[in-house]
Amino acid sequence: SRGRGDVYKRQAYVIGAPGLLNALYDVGVTMNDVDPDYVIVGETASYNYEVITKAVRLVLNGARLIATNSDLTGPTAFGIAPACRALVAPIEMATGKQAYFCGKPNPLMMRTGLRLLHCHSADAVMVGDRMDTDVISGLESGMSTVLVLSGVSTRETIKTYAYRPSMVLNGVGDIVSLARGEKTED
């Protein structure tokens, strides 16, 4: 049995894109679809009934459930699609176990990112297209925030939140225009 302190020597059953598997492999997590320590759910096009069923069985057998982020939906070239929160929900419902969301808006993720960048939150800006993850994670981490309207949140949905971004832009391209001193179409 692996000791609790061997965080980077853990085994996981991973439902996710190759980038997630590579990142986990890079920190020493090995893949195991028989008796893993964790079931880790990210976003992937290969999500199907078989992998959900396997994940449910593994969680019921003691694996801890982790999800990469709590985004319910996300933008694609074809419109809005289910994101990680929607993909992990059937596993949570079938097992009665709640996933630990390690990505935005998790403060640990934000603090770790700032530390790795050797950056203080007062000198950082969080840019994103979602009020419920991107903007709130920036605000709760002490950063200025920029909401871009090229994704999920709209000017109308901003009004439904008790907090506001520092700035609203039409898209990330407007950041370059602002840096050059050009006027944006805001």
Language-model segments: residues:
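Short, small-residue-biased leader/transition segments that mark boundaries at the very start
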Residues: S1-Y8
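Asp-based, Mg2+/Mn2+-dependent phosphohydrolase catalytic module
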Residues: K9-D186
